[in-house]
C-alpha cells in the first residue's frame, strides 16, 4: 500500500520504537526520494494549552515541531486517514513554519 499525505501509519522510528505518525509528504515525493516526511502523534496535553504547531487529531495531536524523514519501508501499517479539515490545518501550519505562506 502506498502512503498518501494525510494518512496515519504505524512507523518504525528506530531504536526498536514504533509510533503512530501523520504522513505529510505526498506519493510523488515518496516515489522519488523513497522517504516520507512524517510528524508523530502524541497524547493531547492540557485542554487549551496546546501550541499552535500542534494540530488536534481526535485525542492525540500531530506534533509538527518534530517533523522527520524516514524511509517509506519503515511505514509498517496504515491506521487510517485524517479528516480533510485536519489535513488542511496541517498544510497551513507547515506553511507558516516554513515561511511558505508568504
For the regions a protein language model found, what residue spans apply to each?
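C-terminal terminal-subdomain/extension
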Residues: 1, 55-102
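Compact nucleic-acid interaction/catalytic patches
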Residues: 12, 17-55
Amino acid at each position: 500500500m502506498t502512503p498518501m499525505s494525510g494518512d496515519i501509519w504505524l512507523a518504525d522510528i528506530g531504536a526498536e520504537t514504533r509510533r503512530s505518525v501523520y504522513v505529510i509528504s505526498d506519493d510523488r515525493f515518496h516515489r522519488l526520494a523513497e522517504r516520507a516526511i512524517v510528524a508523530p502523534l502524541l497524547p493531547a496535553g492540557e485542554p487549551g494549552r496546546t501550541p499552535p504547531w500542534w494540530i488536534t487529531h481526535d485525542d492525540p495531536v500531530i506534533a509538527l515541531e518534530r517533523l522527520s524523514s524516514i524511509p517509506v519501508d519503515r511505514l509498517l501499517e496504515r491506521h487510517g486517514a485524517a479528516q480533510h479539515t485536519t489535513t488542511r490545518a496541517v498544510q497551513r501550519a507547515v506553511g507558516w513554519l516554513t515561511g511558505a505562506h508568504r
